[in-house]
Amino acid sequence: MSRSVKKGPYVLDSLLKKIEEMNKANDKKVIKTWSRASTIFPQMVGHTIAVHDGKKHVPVYITEDMVGHKLGEFAPTRTYKGHSGNEKSTSLR
């Protein structure tokens, strides 16, 4: 279920404030955030945001195609190591 239109998109106020300050200063630093639920705004394009995946911060470079999506979509939380190896050769015939 998506967010109500009358509420508008969610973004952490402090994150948006940092982005706007960096745009004014024409600065491009990596911003660490734990806010995976924040929506990507057009002001964020061109910045790198380190999104927390539960263990570490994953750097995400924001492009125009990402606008409207959530930050958490680009930092996967689960690591898939694959299914177990070749067990068919160990079974009895």
From Swiss-Prot:
Q: What GO annotations for molecular function exist for this entry?
A: rRNA binding; structural constituent of ribosome
Recorded hits in SUPFAM superfamilies, A to Z, give: Ribosomal protein S19 (SSF54570)
Q: Example GO biological process term?
A: translation
InterPro entries recorded: Ribosomal_uS19, Ribosomal_uS19_bac-type, Ribosomal_uS19_CS, Ribosomal_uS19_SF
Query: Which keywords are on file for this protein?
Result: Ribonucleoprotein, Ribosomal protein, RNA-binding, rRNA-binding
Q: Which Pfam families match?
A: Ribosomal_S19
Q: Ribosomal protein: present as a keyword of the record?
A: yes
Gene Ontology cellular component terms for the protein in this record = cytoplasm; small ribosomal subunit
Please give the function described in this protein's UniProt entry: Protein S19 forms a complex with S13 that binds strongly to the 16S ribosomal RNA.
In which family does this protein belong, per the annotation?
A: Belongs to the universal ribosomal protein uS19 family.
User: How is this protein named in the record?
Assistant: Small ribosomal subunit protein uS19
Identify the gene encoding this protein.
rpsS
